Every structure is written in C-alpha cells, then in structure tokens.
C-alpha cells in the first residue's frame, strides 16, 4: 500500500511540474552576441561578418566541421564578404555551450581568402554534434574555390574559375558556373544548372541532375540515377546500378553511358552523324531505316546514324537501351 501511495503522489507531482513548466517557462529564443538560439537558422543574424578586397581573379578556401557552405556572386568588383552563421542546436546541454572549443579563422593572403571552423579538441558532450557553423560568402565573378564540409550542403552560384567541392553527406548545387569543377559527396545529390566547362562529379549514394550544360561532363555514381537535359558537348557516365536519361542539343567528342543494372534512354540530334554501339538486355531504336545502317538485334547494335563520325557507346547488362532521334 505504501508503494502504491508513493507512485500515486509521484505521478501527481510530475503532472503539476509539467503544467508549471509550460505556463511559467515558455520557449525562449535568445539573442546573444549575434547568435540566435532559434532552431531555424534562416532567421539568424550572422555571428560574424568580415570583408576583404582582392585584386583580379581570386581564390577562396572554405572549411567547416558541420554546416552549409554557400558561395554567391555579387556585383561589387573585388569585394569578398563572409558571413558565419552559428546554430547551437542542443549544444547548450553539453560541454560545447560556448565557442571556446572552436577555432574560427577568416583571413587573407594576397588574393587568397580563407574561412574555416575547426575543433580545438574533440568534444564528447552528449549533444555536441548538434552544433553547426554555416558560411554564406559573396564574391566577385572571377573567383576559384575550394569548399569542404563534413556534414552539410554546398552551393556555388555565378562564378568563373577552378572549383573543388567535397561534402561527407550533403547535396551540391552548381548554378551558372564556368570553368573546371570537381564535386564529390558521400551520400547526397549533385545538380548542375547552366554550366559551361569541364564538370567532374561523383556521388556514393545520390542522383546527378544536369539542366543545360556546355562542355564536358564526367559523372560517376554508385547507385543513383542521372537526369541530363539540353547537353551540348561530351558526356561520360559510369553508374553501378542507376538509370541514365540524357537529351543532347549537340555532341562534341563523343558519348559513353555505362550502367550495370539500370536503363538508358538518350535523345540524339538528327543533324549529327554518329558511330553507334549499344549492348543491353533489350534495345529500342527509333524506326528510321534511312538514318541507320549496320547490324542490330534485340540485345546488340553496331552501326552508323547519318553519315557517322562521333562515337556513341551505350552499355547496360540488365537494363534496356532506348535511342531517340530528334
């Protein structure tokens, strides 16, 4: 009886405390030293802002242990503006409730600008992984970049130069970029929109989307799909198991699309001539006997489209190949 009475009073006390907590201590969104504790980082003011000036084409190097990296072109010549956003998440419960455990760097060496956040020592707090440091950086158009994050997304918009991007699990978005790009993500998607140059991309678990590209595309995927539209240039794809869909406006040096188990569908411009090779579980070629000459059965195709010339190779072990002539 004593045990039952004790449990009864304990339950009543817990309910009272819960009501008091809700009434007297509603959620608080504090603002201290430029940091919002609101869980929505979009509404935050920057924790720190720094500006630099570069003379001519510059180079930007960014690293963060956890958070997003956004690099955006702006119209001010030579100006580089860095905004650092801090989201503490649940870190106020842990040993990392202040920023003393992190080394924040923003500096300039000639025409190179460096922005980084690193841990001074490994924090073992229960919620230490919830703390994120995100960069939003405004740069002139002529700017090469080296962008890395262990746990966030990367976006690059409107710049020209040589670019390297790496994230351990986030997405990578590349818009209106010219030059040479190398992008890698361990688990996210990669997208290209209105790009011009040489584009290398690899994802271990996501898809790759391309919308209007001029130049050379080299794409590698573990199991994701490729969706490519309005391509002018050269394209090489290696996928372990995903589908490949590609529409070409013009073809330069050639096309090679390879997937182990997925399907391939390609739209080729009728004004070009191609040396075409395809192997698949089943092949579908648009019925145009005047443009194709060579050998063809349900699983293999070898011949020319039009007058021939540009090599096109389409290979899948277990999927289908569909070839459309526009």
Region spans (language model):
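Intrinsically disordered, low-complexity terminal regions
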Residues: 1-326
């Amino acid at each position: 009886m004593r045990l039952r009475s004790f449990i009864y009073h304990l339950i009543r006390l817990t309910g009272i405390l819960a009501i008091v907590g809700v009434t007297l201590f509603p959620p608080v969104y504090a603002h201290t030293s430029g940091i919002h504790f609101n869980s929505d980082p979009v509404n935050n003011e920057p924790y720190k802002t720094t500006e630099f000036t570069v003379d001519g084409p510059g180079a930007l190097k960014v690293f963060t242990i956890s958070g997003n990296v956004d690099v955006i072109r702006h119209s001010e010549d030579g100006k580089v503006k860095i905004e650092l956003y801090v989201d503490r998440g649940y870190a106020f419960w842990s040993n990392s409730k202040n920023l003393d455990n992190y080394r924040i760097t923003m500096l300039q060496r000639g025409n190179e600008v460096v922005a980084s956040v690193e841990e001074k020592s490994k924090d073992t707090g229960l919620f230490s992984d919830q703390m994120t440091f995100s960069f939003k950086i405004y740069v002139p158009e002529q700017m090469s970049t080296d962008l890395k994050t262990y746990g966030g997304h990367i976006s690059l918009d409107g710049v020209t130069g040589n670019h390297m991007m790496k994230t351990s699990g986030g997405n990578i978005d590349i818009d209106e970029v010219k030059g040479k790009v190398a992008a890698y993500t361990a688990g996210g998607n990669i997208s290209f929109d209105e790009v011009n140059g040489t584009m290398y991309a690899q994802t271990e678990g996501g898809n790759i989307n391309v919308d209007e590209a001029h130049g050379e595309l080299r794409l590698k995927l573990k199991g994701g799909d490729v969706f490519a539209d309005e391509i002018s240039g050269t394209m090489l794809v290696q996928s372990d198991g995903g589908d490949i869909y590609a529409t070409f406006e013009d073809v330069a040096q050639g096309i090679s699309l390879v997937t182990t188990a997925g399907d391939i569908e390609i739209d080729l411009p009728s004004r070009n001539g191609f040396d075409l090779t395809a192997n698949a579980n089943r092949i579908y070629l648009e019925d145009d006997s005047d443009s194709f000459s060579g050998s063809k059965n349900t699983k293999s195709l070898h011949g020319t489209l039009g007058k021939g010339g540009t090599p096109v190779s389409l290979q899948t072990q277990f999927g289908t190949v569909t070839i459309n002539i526009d």
